[in-house]
Structures are given as C-alpha cells and as structure tokens.
C-alpha cells in the first residue's frame, strides 16, 4: 500500500488478547479467518517473539515507542506514557505523513488527540491520566452508539454513563467496536490515499467478555482442547490457585459468590465457568470474536 509519492503507507492493526495459535500460519485450522490467513501468506511471519511485559498498558507502551516499559513510563496499567518519550507518530517526524490513531489507547487520556497523531478516534470513556483535571468528553464510539439508538448500561469512575464492555458485547455485529473501527479506517484511508499516511488501528476484540454477536458460530464440543485444558499448572503460588478458584465459581445466577453483577451478567449470556461445558462455550465464543477481528481486517486491507 503506497501513495503516489512512493513513500510507504503504514497500517498497524492491533487486536487485544488474541493468542498466537488462533491463526492458520501458526497451525490453527478450526477458526474462520480467511483475511488474516491471506495476509499471513503474503507476509513475514514471526515465530520467535516475546512481549516485553504481560500487562496491557506496559506492553502497549513498548509497541508504541520501541522502549521497555520502565523507560516509556507505564510499568502497570493506569500509568500514562512519559511526556518526553516519542511515539511512532512522533518518530516518523515527516510533515508529508498524516498520522491517525483509531481505537483503544490505554496510555493516558483516551479521548484526547495527542502524541503526534493528526487524527484521533477514541473508543473508551473511563481511562483518564488524572481525575483532578475535570471531566473528559465522551469517546467517539460512545457518541456513535448513541446516534445508532443504543443506550449506556453502566457508569464510569466519575459517575457518568458509559457503555460497559459487558453491555457492548450484547450489541449486534454492526455496532461492535471492530465494525466501528472498520468504518473509521476506511474513511481515513479514502481521505488520505493520495498522500503518505500512518494508520494505527487498535480494537478491543477478542478481549473478555468473550461473548459477542457471533456466538454459536463454532461448536464448543468440536474444537480441540489439548492436554492442558482446565489443568492448573504445577508448583504455582497458592494465591494463583485461590484466584483461579474464585473466578471459576461464577455460574448462572448462583449464590456461590456475592458478586451479583458478574453472576447476573454471566446468567444473561448463558455462561458458566464452574463446568467443563461452560469453559468450552467461552472458548468457542472467544474464537468467534477472532472471526469478528478477521472481518475488520478484511475491510481495512
């Protein structure tokens, strides 16, 4: 993808919590991802890569800056990038490029255009670098969903109404974040196709909640599980076992946990993490969200 001025256009697409082994190029043959498969066949496929940090914001900071998290700033979530580090948009430093950021930021104030990007499309309302600087505007995704007739289902840290991840997963496919970002990416590319551009697209899917509009696409019982399915690792700390037991006790509206919100949500989705069948369904729904990502990639590329 190059502009008429022969400077390469850069399109960086990032999904959230997508395992490497969900792609055909890494041996997966049961998830329907034709666009990603075709892209991989015409690409360099990395077979020996390691994330700098397993936590969301620190890992994102490394991808965005090329630095280790302790240098970029975010060593845990909810810490913004340091002001003196450069993002990919600032590193390019070419006035002929139009730099666009679309999607989940998670490195500071999500709804504010910043860090060298000329265009900014936000998707989350409740990640602020500081809650002492006043209320930030709603995200572009929030306003888009409102215009489509949807209603917020929860509240952010400051009490304003928001679309929660759980509530958004109940919406139809054409109202999912991946579909929203597809639309915005197509518009960005169409408007900037005569000049060089760098476009960074960061979607939320297939991040939990694993349910979504394509639930039922895959038969839970027909998907391979492997020998470690539902097997706890050996020689781990007791705190890790306790955390696993806690999250595995959420079931369809049961009283095993006092977390009424989580139980009601899981009951509404028909999910049950206390049984083998429940975990199989969650895996199938997760894989369906990867197909949703694949459809987004197809529209962009």
What is each of the regions a protein language model found here?
Residues 1-301:
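Formylglycine-dependent sulfatase
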């Amino acid at each position: 993808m190059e502009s008429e001025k022969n400077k390469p256009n850069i399109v960086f697409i990032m999904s959230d919590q997508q395992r490497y082994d969900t792609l055909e190029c890494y041996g997966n043959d049961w998830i329907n991802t034709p666009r990603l498969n075709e892209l991989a066949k015409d690409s360099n496929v990395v077979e020996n890569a390691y994330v700098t940090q397993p936590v969301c914001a620190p890992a994102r900071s490394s991808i965005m800056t090329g630095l280790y998290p302790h240098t970029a700033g975010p060593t845990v979530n909810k810490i913004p990038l340091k002001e003196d580090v450069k993002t990919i948009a600032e590193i390019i430093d070419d006035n002929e490029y139009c730099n666009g950021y679309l999607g989940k930021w998670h490195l500071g104030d999500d709804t504010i255009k910043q860090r060298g990007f000329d265009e900014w499309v936000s998707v989350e309302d409740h990640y602020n670098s500081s809650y002492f600087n006043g209320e930030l505007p709603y995200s572009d995704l929030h306003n888009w969903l409102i215009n489509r007739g949807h209603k917020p289902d929860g509240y952010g840290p400051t009490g304003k109404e928001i679309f929660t991840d759980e509530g958004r997963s109940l919406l139809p496919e054409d109202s999912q974040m991946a579909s929203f970002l597809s639309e915005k990416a197509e518009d960005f590319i169409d408007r900037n196709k005569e000049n060089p551009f760098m476009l960074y697209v960061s979607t939320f899917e297939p991040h939990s909640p694993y349910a979504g509009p394509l639930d039922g696409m895959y038969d839970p019982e027909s998907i391979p599980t492997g020998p470690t399915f539902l097997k706890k690792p050996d020689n781990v700390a007791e705190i890790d076992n306790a955390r696993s037991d806690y999250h595995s006790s959420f079931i369809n509206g049961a009283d095993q946990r006092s977390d009424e919100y989580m139980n009601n949500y899981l009951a509404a989705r028909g999910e049950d993490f206390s049984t083998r069948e429940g975990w199989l369904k969650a895996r199938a729904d997760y894989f369906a969200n990867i197909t949703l990502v694949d459809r987004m990639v197809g529209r962009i590329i």
